[in-house]
């Protein structure tokens, strides 16, 4: 029986759990740092991060299902330092090119498209119905929200969040820790640590 540990028992965690089942995991074991939760729908929560770290050998794989990019990366680094068997999960209805690179800890959701020679970093969220075109470079801990379209040869820095329904023009460079607001159209480069919103997207101070 294939068993996976999922750290993070929120709404995002539920989606990750279903993808894990579709990928062949028969047993889902949740962990969460909230003291107020004992279950995630029908799945029992078996403890917090420390409990997961102390029981890693019991699992065939583990993944972090936390929406906050910074926290997700903190947790993935902790698990890596403890030799966790971190996996990626790809929904069966996603279209992922055999020429793309998907690094560990990343989740690719239903109807997402990853085209040839795109590289997706560690512990990214590529959400429902989003498109990453050819030759894109997506850094570690990035969240690409539902219905986002990233054109070819775009570079997105680590821990950046691209809001739902946004579009990014080809050859654009988006920095580290950037927030792009929902429905935005990015036609110019965005520097590190910026927030950009609108059509076209403009940097907000």
Predicted ranges, named:
Residues 128, 137-140, 145-205:
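Glycine-rich hexapeptide-repeat left-handed beta-helix
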Residues 1-40, 46-49, 53-54:
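Hydrophobic, well-ordered beta-alpha structural blocks that scaffold small-molecule cofactor pockets
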Residues 17-20, 74-78, 120-121, 191-192:
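Short amphipathic alpha-helical segments
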Residues 28, 60, 104, 158:
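Conserved acidic residues
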Residues 62-65, 108, 197:
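Redox-cofactor binding/interface segments in oxidoreductases and associated redox assembly factors
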């Amino acid at each position: 029986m294939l068993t996976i540990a999922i750290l993070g028992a929120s709404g995002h965690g539920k989606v990750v759990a279903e993808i894990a089942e579709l990928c062949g995991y028969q047993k889902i074991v949740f962990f969460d740092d909230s003291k107020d939760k004992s279950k995630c729908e029908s799945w029992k929560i078996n403890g917090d991060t420390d409990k997961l770290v102390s029981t890693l050998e019991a699992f065939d794989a583990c993944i972090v299902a936390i929406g906050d990019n910074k926290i997700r990366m903190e947790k993935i680094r902790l698990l890596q330092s403890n030799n966790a068997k971190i996996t990626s999960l790809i929904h069966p209805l996603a279209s992922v090119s055999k020429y793309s690179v998907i690094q560990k800890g990343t989740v690719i959701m239903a109807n997402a498209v990853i085209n040839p020679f795109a590289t997706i970093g560690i512990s990214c969220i590529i959400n429902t119905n989003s498109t990453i075109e050819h030759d894109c470079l997506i850094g570690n801990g990035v969240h690409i929200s539902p219905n986002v379209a990233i054109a070819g040869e775009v570079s997105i820095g680590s821990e950046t969040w691209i809001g739902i329904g946004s579009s990014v023009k080809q050859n654009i460079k988006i920095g580290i820790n950037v927030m792009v607001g929902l429905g935005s159209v990015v036609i110019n480069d965005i520097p590190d640590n910026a927030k950009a919103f609108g059509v076209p997207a403009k940097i907000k101070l």
